Amino acid sequence: MSKELSYDLVVVGGGPAGSSAAFAAAKKGIKVALIEKENCIAETVRTSGVTWIQNIKEFGIPDDCYNPIKNFSFCSPNNEVTISDSEARAAVLDVRKTYRWLATQAENEGVDIFVKTNINNVIKNNNGDIIGVKGT
């Protein structure tokens, strides 16, 4: 059975870029669908990272999405640099939780999120512009 839906914008991929794009568009009143092939947002995240708490706060990321650190080291085969401070200025992100938070922010702005959906074809007009997608 085929189902046709209509959106102003379809974002394929529910990672941080896709979720952020969907969120930003929805805030401007655009009707957005966010398509993710996995069973849920951030299901197969294989990354982590350290970033500055100031930047985390600027993006509004909740406290439960990161773990503050006061000491950390950068290591290479030939060198190691350790940074220590009495105040936590950096943090390790819980990337999976952060990506899911981003998607939730998009959803709260009215974005429709479709998981377990693979896009297998694009629909083009006579000029070659992409005007739609087909998925399963």
Indicate residue ranges for each PLM-predicted region:
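Short solvent-exposed loop/turn micro-motifs enriched in small/polar/acidic residues
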Residues: 2, 65-67
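Glycine-rich FAD pyrophosphate-binding loop
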Residues: 10, 14, 23-46
